[in-house]
Amino acid sequence: MASTTAPSRTNSRVNYSNEIHDLSTVQSVSAVPSVYYPEKSFADIFPPNLLKKVISEVVATFLLVFVTCGAASIYGEDMKRISQLGQSVVGGLIVTVMIYATGHISGAHMNPAVTLSFAFFRHFPWIQVPFYWAAQFTGAMCAAFVLRAVLYPIEVLGTTTPTGPHWHALVIEIVVTFNMMFVTCAVATDSRAVGELAGLAVGSAVCITSIFAGPVSGGSMNPARTLAPAVASNVYTGLWIYFLGPVVGTLSGAWVYTYIRFEEAPAAAGGAAPQKLSSFKLRRLQSQSMAADEFDNV
């Protein structure tokens, strides 16, 4: 007479992913898959080049605020030296120069609202946002107080204040910052754009929009650029506008471009996935690599 044996049933405690699970039944024919969550190392959270990026943002934001607020201060004191158009051109040029100078190091954000938008749409790691903000406000504050020393006795150091109703200035700041961020996303986050023209495109956007925004709101588009001279000059009129406006403008500009852009076709089996580029990482190396590959295939 053949005997039958029932499958063995055991109660055990098995550790999966550092968690204890009580298993009422373990079948020998089926294995319970273990789940592994790799822990991020210190180098993943704080990469070795983070300090260099922070210093780059301090320098870039310092020069941005020093030049733009310096030009605005001289314009406010003597309009014959620098015109309103001259201020706009200066602002656009310094943005262009700083993108080419520091874009390959830190991304040349120079703007807390831009950093926030890049992080929100996953073009920049959230863990580095506080460091960038600290660098940007530090550079801006240093520039404002240096201007206070070298331009004495000028008391108003290029502050941005609304010339009319506050809601007029708020709408203007949202629109001009939207334009700046829309262009920025087009040339800095889309791999099909020509990276070498990123600085010229963004600088031109800043120049064009500040020409008509200047007489209404000052054309700040940057909370750090507004806060620093406000503290150095002790002028805080409508300060909230220049925090809310740029944040809304950059987030909406980035969202609209992200929504309307065409998605790249997925890579074929075994092929390389499309490269995701963030901030103002210029693409000279990418184009040189493609040229080298074409040369090798000849």
UniProtKB/Swiss-Prot annotation:
Membrane topology: Multi-pass membrane protein
UniProt keyword terms in alphabetical order: Cell membrane, Membrane, Repeat, Transmembrane, Transmembrane helix, Transport
Regions crossing the membrane: 54-74, 88-108, 127-147, 169-189, 197-217, 240-260
An annotated Gene Ontology molecular function: channel activity
Main location: membrane
Coiled-coil ranges from the UniProt annotation: none
Tissue-specific expression: Expressed at low levels in roots and leaves. Expressed in roots, leaf sheaths and leaf blades. In roots, it localizes in the plasma membrane of all cells of the young region and is more abundant on the distal side than the proximal side (at protein level). Expressed only in the xylem parenchyma cells adjacent to vessels in both leaf sheaths and leaf blades (at protein level). Is more abundant on the side facing the vessel (at protein level).
One Gene Ontology cellular component: plasma membrane
Residue span of motif NPA 2: 222-224
Motif, NPA 1: chain positions: 111-113
Domain of life: Eukaryota
Pfam families: MIP
Subcellular location field: Cell membrane
Function: Silicon transporter involved in the distribution of silicon in shoots. Is responsible for the transport of silicon from the xylem to the leaf tissues. Silicon is beneficial to plant growth and helps plants to overcome abiotic and biotic stresses by preventing lodging (falling over) and increasing resistance to pests and diseases, as well as other stresses. In the nodes, involved with LSI2 and LSI3 in silicon intervascular transfer, which is required for the preferential distribution of silicon, such as hyperaccumulation of silicon in the husk.
Record remark on domains: Aquaporins contain two tandem repeats each containing three membrane-spanning domains and a pore-forming loop with the signature motif Asn-Pro-Ala (NPA).
Family assignment from sequence similarity: Belongs to the MIP/aquaporin (TC 1.A.8) family. NIP (TC 1.A.8.12) subfamily.
UniProt protein name: Aquaporin NIP2-2
